[in-house]
Regions:
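Polar/charged low-complexity regulatory segments
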Residues: 1-106, 110-159, 165, 170-176
């Protein structure tokens, strides 16, 4: 977590320098609350994340989107060895600044939504700090499926997201 820093700080840039759409910025706000919830569980900011998702996205999609963002964060965190830098959602700088890690997170989502699998893989490797990216990408794919940006069986991915489970294509049912 970062306090009020300026954009000249290494690893921090202006959100306006990137072409994030409104949906992606809403995802960032929800993700920031979930990042904080992982760092400070007693704060229970996950409740605020789900509430914000319900307010930003029509029912029943809000809770589903928050849930999949939470799953993607869990999968991302599994391989990371260094700290994850983020801005708290209620921080004054959160409206204008973004950390490299937050940017990689959003760029992975943007790349999946644009069906640019190679770019999504690159951002996922930087974010997850290694090659264990498949579950993270499947979770991010789930966000794009909910929004209708991609079909359930997107080229380049080995499955679709159903919660945290993948589908067995031979049986077309969830693998537990």
């Amino acid at each position: 977590m970062l306090s009020d820093l300026n954009p000249s700080f290494d690893g921090i840039s202006k959100i306006s320098d990137y072409n994030f759409d409104k949906f992606e910025l809403k995802v960032l706000g929800i993700a920031r609350l979930l990042f904080e919830s992982n760092e400070y569980p007693i704060a229970q900011t996950w409740k605020s994340a789900f509430l914000k998702a319900e307010q930003n996205f029509s029912s029943p999609f809000g809770a589903s989107i928050a849930h999949i963002i939470s799953i993607s964060i869990d999968f991302m965190s599994n391989g990371r060895t260094s700290n994850f830098n983020y801005f708290k959602e209620n921080n004054n700088s959160s409206l204008t600044l973004i950390t490299d890690e937050e940017r990689y997170f959003l760029m992975a989502l943007k790349s999946i939504r644009n069906n640019n699998i190679s770019k999504a893989n690159s951002y996922a490797v930087m974010l997850c700090e290694g090659p264990q990216i498949n579950k993270f990408l499947l979770a991010m794919e789930g966000i794009a499926i909910i929004t209708g940006d991609i079909e359930k069986k997107a080229a380049g991915f080995n499955g679709a997201v159903d919660g945290a489970r993948t589908r067995d294509p031979r049986r077309d049912r969830p693998v537990l």
